[in-house]
């Protein structure tokens, strides 16, 4: 019995997007879905109860950061990550690979793994496929990610080819080192940059290993959105229909819709809480920076079309005041709103798939949000 099971429900006749449900040891969630990111075993400023009120069925935590603080052994002693953070729904943990390649100034890649420096204190560390599995097995997440190399954009074909081959070998080692396949599902990560030939090779390698789910990695690392969409168009069809598909590190509203249209089931990103901390809010009418002076006497909600806790109870003027005074409650209110906005957006996407009208929904949303305007601002 596998720990993770994907249930296909239907395909949107207008776009080919798919509606489904992922079953995990800690409950099920409908897809396509957005996963709030709780890097250090907390979604910044949010309580588990608030996330449940938004109907979040799965969140993401970070293997690299939890390995450094408080340490995976402490979390194991606490009974696993679910008990440690009082979250009884699904958790996905990444492998730590992205942080190793993005946060460390010094790193040396070899076949065994990666030597790098702790970004907190400069200590020398080593992370391998086996170590990434050991940490994630201790954390006890429902979905684990294989340890991979995530090259930046752009990278040469020659470098990316070697990287893909190494990532495939590391994926095989992850499968062998994974100690709890009946309790935790391990996803493989398809790499290959913008190169179709390499994406095909990576997908072929990983699909032959029969992971319970697959991620598309190496996107949202600086490439233009048209390249990301093109890569998804030739990569997603290479993945099994009966397994979940996860696009890593993507969370802008337009990319969530475009990813779903291209067959993606799961997304994650720090974007909604990161931009909330500087007062940037997602609304049904586009991007709103609540710190702006024009909102000082605006006593309406952040988004008149939103029914979240923030919008039902507090005004733009009040939230602006809190943000200008560096009050934590202001960050809580904007974070709550942004997370609710994306989770609600995904429910609208699922409903549009049910009604076979996701293409129409995309056009309506892009027009209302302002993505169709020349030089439209993104996040």
Curated annotation (Swiss-Prot):
Keywords: Glycosyltransferase, Metal-binding, Queuosine biosynthesis, Transferase, tRNA processing, Zinc
Catalytic activity as recorded in UniProt: 7-aminomethyl-7-carbaguanine + guanosine(34) in tRNA = 7-aminomethyl-7-carbaguanosine(34) in tRNA + guanine
Swiss-Prot/TrEMBL cofactor(s): Zn(2+)
InterPro entries, per database record: ArchSynthase1/Queuine_TRR, TGT, TGT-like_sf, tRNA_ribo_trans-like
GO CC terms, sorted: cytoplasm; cytosol
Residues annotated as binding Zn(2+): 306, 308, 311, 337
EC code: 2.4.2.29
UniProt name for this protein: Queuine tRNA-ribosyltransferase
Name of encoding gene: tgt
